[in-house]
């Protein structure tokens, strides 16, 4: 009502019926999307998005090895063209640390490690040492993705079947995201 009133003062007309229709469509899409499964913010499950999603697990593992166990994923954003990965770390990465991280991810890719999906109770996954970013978003039964001895994480997927499918990993940029959080932008070639 307020919107219509303000629009009227400006000589504009509001398509109330059109708005109601679009709002109802949005509500229905939201209902369909909330099936109780957490997808980790991945909007699309195309081939490249799937590859980048698996690459985030390898990058997380490599960062822990290069920078230390204080590293934890803080977020990610994946498109068909690139990946963005936010992680806890107090300082800018050196060129050597970036090179070591990139080389380690590429080593994991060349190792052709099978990617296994395991289903189990959330508490059992945590006892196994599986990492979980948004633990409250998962149900009682979770999917855990195991990439050899490299990575073990709760995740909604999707993932490639083998790390060899990823191609070559390249860090394009490393920058501050917020206090104590760094951001890596990377591509697969």
Task: Identify the residue ranges that each predicted region occupies.
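A glycine- and charged-residue-rich anion-binding loop/surface
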Residues: 1-189
